[in-house]
Amino acid sequence: MDRHSSYIFIWLQLELCAMAVLLTKGEIRCYCDAAHCVATGYMCKSELSACFSRLLDPQNTNSPLTHGCLDSLASTADICRAKQAQNHSGPTMPTLECCHEDMCNYRGLHDVLSPPKSEASGQGNRYQHDSSRNLITKVQELTSSKELWFRAAVIAVPIAGGLILVLLIMLALRMLRSENKRLQDQRQQMLSRLHYSFHGHHSKKGQVAKLDLECMVPVSGQENCCLTCDKMRQADLSNEKILSLVHWGMYSGHGKLEFV
């Protein structure tokens, strides 16, 4: 029992160490609009803890944006630095934007990366940017709450499984002990019955022999003096199925007995 307890304690320690390593490993969720992210709800996990947003065509200011995790970038030259591309009209604009928070690259508007063209457009962009920030905040709160529940489940499920395993082992040991005790009691009862039947059989045989000796020597000269002995002996013989060598006959008055 002590050995099983030490093994279970070591296994629980290893499980807790593995969970601590997984939880301390930095991973964030990013908004992803690639084809392989459709099945995961337009989200991906970044082990580099970095999300990106970039223009598909750096030379075109009206080019659509693409979003995703920095791990999925094929080229290592775009790793989290804002590249500057010179357009034909002269203004500079970033082709890659990186961030390091959950769903921080969620952008619903193209002009997030584009510079303002006029004062009016800049004012409208500010309002749109504020609404986009509010949406991002809501998404981040929802994601953080889901992440919190997920981490709690990751911690609680192995601990609950370990406790259930310990309870099952203790229950199995208790059942084995009770079964062993029951078998020992049955064995003791069987031995007691055999001992009692053996000694009871020998005592009955002694009583039958004593009865034979008493009936062989009659007290008076009357006939059928052993009638009572015959009845008692026949009852014992019918119960125990013991055959006697003496055949009881009628007393002739001369003390003569007939034997088979």
From Swiss-Prot:
GO MF term set: frizzled binding
Bilayer disposition of the protein: Single-pass type I membrane protein
Listed CDD domains: TFP_LU_ECD_BAMBI
Signal peptide range: 1-26
Gene Ontology, cellular component aspect: cytoplasm; plasma membrane
UniProt main location, coarse: membrane
Pfam families xref list: BAMBI, BAMBI_C
TM stretches of this protein: 153-173
GO biological process terms, semicolon-separated: cell migration; negative regulation of BMP signaling pathway; negative regulation of osteoblast differentiation; negative regulation of transforming growth factor beta receptor signaling pathway; positive regulation of canonical Wnt signaling pathway; positive regulation of cell population proliferation; positive regulation of DNA-templated transcription; positive regulation of epithelial to mesenchymal transition
InterPro entries membership: BAMBI, BAMBI_C, BAMBI_N, Snake_toxin-like_sf
Keyword flag Transmembrane helix: yes
Residue intervals on the Cytoplasmic side: 174-260
Extracellular side: 27-152
Statement: the UniProt record of this protein carries the keyword Phosphoprotein: no
Compartment list: Membrane
Residues modified by glycosylation: 87
Keywords for the protein's UniProt record, in alphabetical order: Glycoprotein, Membrane, Signal, Transmembrane, Transmembrane helix
Tissue: Detected in granulosa and thecal cells of adult ovaries and in spermatogonia, spermatocytes, round spermatids, and Sertoli cells of adult testes.
Function statement: Negatively regulates TGF-beta signaling.
Family: Belongs to the BAMBI family.
Protein name: BMP and activin membrane-bound inhibitor homolog
